[in-house]
Amino acid sequence: MSFYFDKNTDIKSNEKTVHVNINNLMYAFITDNNVFSKKGLDFGTRTMLECLDLKSINGDVLDFGCGYGPVGIYIKSNTNSNVDMIDINERAINLAKKNAKLNNVDVNIFESDIYSNVSKKYDYIITNPPIRVGKEILYKILVGALDYLKENGSLIFVINKDQGAKSTMEYLKNYYNVNILEKNKGFYVFQCQKHWLIA
């Protein structure tokens, strides 16, 4: 499962198109080997997207670890937000660009190792983070988002209870005001707003 946090593109390409229904809206996505959830939208990402209050999402949005692009494309197609999408995986970036065109959305997609190429601040950072990288890097991603959120910005992410949802929530309370947006079959969707004590 090197695709979770890997620039490797040596695995042979085998592009396929999957059709996905999200909140009764149909999307087509080109997927490939060495990208996350290549057979279709995974349950965690679906849980996160379907619980979002799209009317409240506006301004600048970052889709962190975009993969082939379902999160950013869904948000852009349903809001007036300016959406940036990043991933470390070159194949995922190329697929996301193809899928943005396929779904007729105007988004900005670029490669970044965590936040290395991110130069602005966002109203929302939204992610199904790469859990299998381990807690050290996971926390670096989640806490690191603080530096890239605007004053009242929010980090929204999904994580399974078996992957440490509750311990992650408790850890993030040191940095954010944390709310549970959704719980579904072991998946937790958290919204984390900057703690008022943190500039």
Give residue spans per PLM region:
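A short glycine-rich, Lys/Arg-flanked "PGG" loop and its adjoining helix->strand segment in the class I
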Residues: 139-151
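Conserved SAM-binding loop
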Residues: 85, 157, 181
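Conserved beta-strand signature within the Rossmann-like core of class I S-adenosyl-L-methionine
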Residues: 152-159
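Conserved SAM-binding loop and adjacent beta-strand
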Residues: 32-49
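Conserved SAM/SAH cofactor-binding pocket of Class I
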Residues: 44-127
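Core SAM-dependent methyltransferase catalytic element
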Residues: 183-199
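N-terminal auxiliary segments of SAM/dcSAM-dependent transferases
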Residues: 1-23, 34
